[in-house]
Amino acid sequence: MPLVFIKNIDNDTRLGLWKIADELHTDEVCPQMVCNELKQKCARRQTETVAVYALLHAITGRTDLVIGHNADGKPTIDGYNISISHTIGYASIIISKRKNVAVDIEYRNNRVFRIVDKFLTKQEQNMLKELIKTSNPSSPQTNIASQTDCYDTQTALLLCWCAKETLYKYFSEEKLMFNEMQTKLKTISSEGSFENFNLKRGTLKDIMYMQNEKFVLTYTL
């Protein structure tokens, strides 16, 4: 079953995860206007879109909703606030009628090591290095970016990457730069939360997460 889960975050907010597969056709879950548009898209884009609409239907029970985008590129649907993310193999949606929401998902990969300096300051990298050293004393005591064989380091970096992507989406109208966000990951477990800051406006947001051997997922509301 492609549906991995639907989680009720609170009475107003639902989070869903879908495993992308080629089992559905566009006309089974997508509104007709979306089906027409998808004919011009590549096969990968079609599969991702079908997964998103299948998950949207599973969460809301509706097949008439059409996903649009506002001027900031943020997805929109009638009657809900929505955030969407997809990565290789998975699609995720979070929706709420009253709350602003954001979600991000990333499959496990080592690309994150190559872009450490892009999204983390030296201070943030040093904080992660101390966290990993404390949680796993046998981990290599080298530069974060070179610890490609350390599972804990990969997890920490992916959590921070997804958290900043989530914060960017949450404050989409501000178009935050990576150095205008600060992440403070203090522990790593299968599920949890940690503080993240919008430095531009001095706002703190708790980012919730779940992670396993396949992916890392973060969200906020």
Language-model-derived ranges and their functions:
Residues 1-136, 150-221:
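Core catalytic alpha/beta fold that binds nucleotide/phospho-ligands
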Residues 141-142, 147, 154:
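Charged/polar low-complexity intrinsically disordered segments
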